[in-house]
Regions:
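Hydrophobic positions on the alpha1 helix immediately C-terminal to the Walker A/P-loop
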Residues: 72, 76
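Conserved P-loop NTPase motor core of helicases/translocases
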Residues: 86-91, 95-159, 200-201, 210-211, ...
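Conserved lysine of the Walker
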Residues: 69
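Walker A (P-loop) phosphate-binding loop of P-loop NTPases
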Residues: 66
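Conserved helicase motor core of P-loop NTPases
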Residues: 172-255
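Interdomain "pre-motor" coupling segment immediately N-terminal to P-loop NTPase/helicase cores
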Residues: 1-26
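Short hydrophobic/aromatic beta-strand immediately N-terminal to the Walker A/P-loop
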Residues: 59-62, 88, 167
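N-terminal pre-P-loop "Q-motif" helix
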Residues: 39-55
Length: 255
C-alpha cells in the first residue's frame, strides 16, 4: 500500500507540474461557443471547473448528484475535440462506463479495458498483471472516481504520459471503492490538487426527491415531506416511519 500511495503522490505531482501544453486561448469566447452549441448556460461554478481544467494538468471536480458534473464533462469533451485533442473517457465499472457513454454520446471504457488488464481467477485486485497498456490521450476523464482504489489509481498514473491532462470527477460521499484506500477523498483533503466543489442542485435534478434528500442527509438536514416539493416532483422517494417489523415488510412490498 505504501509503495502504491507514494508512487501515486509522486506521479500526480509530476503530471501537475509538467508544462501545460494544452492551453486553449480565448477561453471565455470558446466556452461561449460551447454554450451556444450545447444549448446550455453554465453556472459560475461550472465555468470555474472548466477553467481550472484548462489551466491545470490535474484537476478534481466533485459534487453530489444533480450538481452538473455531467454537463461539465460534455462541455470539456466538445471543447477539446474542437481543438483536435484526443479525449478519453473511462469509469471504474461497466455500468458507470455505459452511463457515461449514454450521457456524453462518446464511448467510455472501464479502466480495466482501457489499461488492458484483467483479474485472475481468485478475483483479487492485488494480483492484476503488471503489464498495462499506455493511455494515449491528451485529456483523460475518469468518472465515479470515488470507486477507484489505490491499486487501480497506481496503474492509471503509471500509464498516463506526462503532458496529458487528468480530470477526476466524482462524489467523495458516494460509492466508496471496494478495494483499499479513499483516493478521491484523500486527494481533496490534501489540497495539493486544484479542486472545484459543485453544490448547486439544478432545477431538473431538484424534481427528484432522491437527489434532494441525498443532499439533505449529507448536510445533516431532515428529510423533506411531500408538501415541500414542487408540484411536478418525481415520486421516487418514500419515507415510512414504522417500528413493527412485519408492517415494515408489508410497506416495502406494497411500494
Amino acid at each position: 500500500f505504501f509503495k502504491a500511495e507514494t508512487n501515486i503522490a509522486e506521479r500526480l505531482l509530476k503530471l501537475q507540474n509538467f508544462k501545460n501544453v494544452k492551453y486553449i486561448k480565448n477561453f471565455k469566447e470558446e466556452i461561449s461557443k460551447q454554450e451556444t452549441k450545447l444549448a446550455i448556460k453554465l453556472s459560475e461554478k461550472q465555468f470555474e471547473a472548466i477553467e481550472q481544467i484548462n489551466e491545470n494538468n490535474v484537476c478534481i471536480i466533485t459534487g453530489g448528484p444533480g450538481t452538473g458534473k455531467t454537463t461539465i464533462i460534455k462541455c470539456m469533451l466538445d471543447l477539446y475535440k474542437a481543438h483536435k485533442r484526443k479525449v478519453v473517457l473511462c469509469a471504474p465499472t461497466g455500468r458507470a462506463a455505459k452511463r457515461m457513454t449514454e450521457t456524453t454520446g462518446e464511448e467510455a471504457k472501464t479502466i480495466h479495458r482501457l489499461l488492458e488488464i484483467g483479474k485472475v481467477e481468485d478475483d483479487k485486485l492485488g494480483t492484476i498483471d503488471t503489464d498495462i497498456s499506455p493511455i494515449d490521450a491528451d485529456v483523460l476523464i475518469i468518472d465515479e472516481m470515488s470507486m477507484v482504489d489505490i491499486f487501480l489509481m497506481n496503474y492509471i498514473v503509471k500509464a498516463l504520459f506526462l503532458g496529458s491532462k487528468l480530470v477526476l470527477v466524482g462524489d467523495s460521499n458516494q460509492l466508496p471503492s471496494v478495494g483499499p484506500g479513499s483516493i478521491l477523498k484523500d486527494l481533496i483533503e490534501s489540497e495539493k490538487i486544484p479542486t472545484v466543489s459543485l453544490n448547486k442542485i439544478f432545477r431538473q435534478a431538484a424534481k427528484s426527491k432522491i437527489i434532494v434528500n441525498a443532499h439533505n442527509v449529507n448536510n445533516g438536514v431532515n428529510f423533506i415531506g411531500k408538501k415541500d416539493y414542487e408540484e411536478d416532483a418525481e415520486e421516487d422517494f418514500f419515507y415510512v416511519n414504522e417500528s413493527n417489523q412485519d408492517k415494515m415488510l408489508y410497506q416495502v412490498i406494497s411500494l
